[in-house]
Amino acid sequence: MAIHLYKTSTPGTRNGAVDSQVKSNPRNNLIYGQHRCGKGRNARGIITARHRGGGHKRLYRKIDFRRNEKDIYGRIVTIEYDPNRNAYICFIHYGDGEKRYILHPRGAIIGDIIVSGTEVPIKMGNALPLTDMPLGTAIHNIEITLGRGGQLARAAGAVAKLIAKEGKSATLKLPSGEVRLISKNCSATVGQVGNVGVNQKSLGRAGSKCWLGKRPVVRGVVMNPVDHPHGGGEGRAPIGRKKPATPWGHPALGRRSRKRNKYSDNLILRRRSK
């Protein structure tokens, strides 16, 4: 990814750094409008997800997470920006005339050929079952349930590793550090998701953040006691507690947030590292 650094001509462009190469040119048959009316609210209008609101209108791109065009070669025609995710997407022309979007694998360029199936080469961008991959393969867009499409390792720069195969299961190390079991019949895409340098971008001003639909984040220590457990006091007062708390009074910073007694507890060999 090419990072474009702004010249300091105005305060808004000072220290700004954005991607200057990838553009957006969505295809009409692969997009549809989405009604984003919630802005972090539930059906009663109460905020359930803070710091969301505003933002530019978006068209949703239909991404092919299943990769079910088996044994049909496709060519990368364009690499495009997707406002609904931080990874780029590729526009693919298949040999049978089908046209689809997929996640952009790192290093893929326009003109590359990809294919999905059971007996395809271990090449960046190809999709195949885990049982046909050698150990140590870097993968992304991993299925959890057979035929449901990729659900793991889909963010920009995400990559998992196939570390073992035994019986009907394969052992994967996920980007979070979690080690878990997945059926060997599930499919995944070879390689790493592109746009690795997404964290190097600097928006430069608050208005650019608002375009993304992200509202300002206010510290609890500067609020009133009615708004946050850390609020109140005279001047720059500490939080007044032994341990930090969430706005609803629950323990923060270290408390486990995973739901208990989930079906997948037996599939997780090592919990994620923080």
Swiss-Prot record:
Q: Where is this region: Disordered?
A: 1-21, 225-274
The major lineage groups are: Eukaryota, Viridiplantae, Streptophyta, Embryophyta, Tracheophyta
Q: What are its GO biological-process terms?
A: mitochondrial translation
Q: Which gene encodes it?
A: rpl2-A
Give the protein name, as stated in the record.
Large ribosomal subunit protein uL2cz/uL2cy
Give the main localization category: plastid
Q: Which UniProt keywords apply?
A: Chloroplast, Plastid, Ribonucleoprotein, Ribosomal protein
Q: Where in the cell is it found?
A: Plastid, Chloroplast
Gene Ontology CC annotations of this record: chloroplast; mitochondrial large ribosomal subunit
Query: What GO MF annotations does this protein's record show?
Result: rRNA binding; structural constituent of ribosome; transferase activity
- Keyword Chloroplast present in the record's keywords: the answer is yes
Query: Which organism encodes this protein?
Result: Gossypium barbadense (Sea Island cotton)
| Subunit structure, interactors included | Part of the 50S ribosomal subunit.
Q: Which family does this protein fall into?
A: Belongs to the universal ribosomal protein uL2 family.
HAMAP family, A to Z: Ribosomal_uL2_B
Q: Which Pfam families match?
A: Ribosomal_L2, Ribosomal_L2_C
